Amino acid sequence: VLIIAVLFLTACQLTTAETYSRGRQKHRARRSTDRNSKWTRECTDSGGACNSHDQCCNEFCSTATRTCI
């Protein structure tokens, strides 16, 4: 009887953990498609003004001229 009780409790914990992780995965997928994501962000083309490398489409900003190269 003790063995059956332990197996039952283990199965309940595994089911709960699986359901919980599924909910978290959906939330994580939603966050990765956020507008701030690198894949959906807008960028400045070559020759446009920039302050840092991550603003340029090719990810290179000239510090001397403050333009994307």
UniProtKB/Swiss-Prot annotation:
Q: In which tissues is it expressed?
A: Expressed by the venom duct.
| Propeptide position ranges | 18-41
For this UniProt record, give its keywords in alphabetical order, as a comma-separated list.
Disulfide bond, Knottin, Secreted, Signal, Toxin
What InterPro entries does the entry give?
Conotoxin
A GO MF label = ion channel inhibitor activity
- The secretion signal range is 1-17
Where in the cell? Secreted
Superkingdom of origin: Eukaryota
Instruction: Report one GO cellular component.
Output: extracellular region
| Cysteine disulfide partners in this protein | C43-C57, C50-C61, C56-C68
Q: What family name appears in the similarity comment? A: Belongs to the conotoxin O1 superfamily.
- Additional facts recorded: This precursor corresponds to allele E1bii. Has not been merged with other alleles since they may differ due to geographic variation (see strain in PubMed:19606224).
Instruction: Note what the entry says on domains.
Output: The presence of a 'disulfide through disulfide knot' structurally defines this protein as a knottin.
Listed name of the protein: Conotoxin Eb6.14
Source organism (scientific name) = Conus ebraeus (Hebrew cone)
